[in-house]
Amino acid sequence: MKVFKKLASVFAAAAMVLSVTACSQNGGSSSGTEASGNTSGDSSAVTQGSFRTLDQIKESGKIVIGVFSDKNPFGYVDNEGKFQGYDVYFAERIAKDLGVELELTPVEAASRVEFLETAKVDIILANFTVTEERAQKVDFALPYMKVALGVVSPDSAVITDPAQLNGKTLIVVKGTTAETYFTENYPDVKLQKYDEYNQAYTALSDGRGDAFSTDNTEVLAWAMSNPGFTVGVESLGNTDAIAPAVSKGNETLLKWINDEITALADEQFFHADYDATLAAVYGDNVDKDSLVVEGGKM
């Protein structure tokens, strides 16, 4: 089921609270970044309400990056209390190349923009889809991944067409492109909204909804590890760019990230990231070149 071979390269390169923190000098390894128990939601490395420039981050010796803690295999905390995933691997490399310590702060989908607007983090690396609406509030760097939407449902009543959901209940996570897409295109679908991905998957497993929609990369990975569920809609909507985001107007940090993504193409970094964090999950079911973006070129 080479699902991602269906994803066409149609976008130009985008140039545009429980909180757990983690500190690491690790540079892009697959060993994970250890999570520790700060539950304040604030970081001493960030001045609230005012973003930090590249020079200020370097002077502080620490960069704060917002990631998911419950979206396996992209950003999650494992059984040993360490952050893992595709986004985390990239975050570790950013800190290494900047020569600073890494602090990871978990974010929810609906809080990603707010964490940048209030400068709670320096960068968001949390499966952040580039949209025009979001780009009015934050600045997106070049993309490093591409996705569409997918729909997962129980084997006993597989949803193969979104129109089948009219009059039924679809589980979504607040602040995601899935929420926006179904609100705009399928008004007769009843949306059951959750703040966190683990809440949404629990609701699906408990039968509180007929299906769940989010990025197809995510639902496919989840279905592979949860027998009894099928991704009946493998690619829905546009092929979208996933990119890092910084606070609006933080030009020095944005330029550094764009330069970093461009330079990392020489070593095929994101293919290595895929091999370290995603290959074991997807196996032969995914063509990595249909997901991975190198050098910001979709």
Task: Give the predicted meaning of each segment.
Residues 28-29, 47-48, 180-194, 231-235, ...:
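Ligand-binding clefts/hinges and TM-proximal coupling segments of bilobed small-molecule sensing domains
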Residues 103-114, 157, 174-177, 192-202, ...:
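Short helix-initiation/N-cap motifs at beta->coil->alpha
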Residues 18-22:
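C-terminal motif of bacterial Sec signal peptides marking the signal peptidase cleavage site
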Residues 114, 128-136, 183-184, 205-239:
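A ligand-binding cleft/hinge motif common to bilobed small-molecule-binding domains
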Residues 145-153, 220-261, 281-298:
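Periplasmic-binding protein-like
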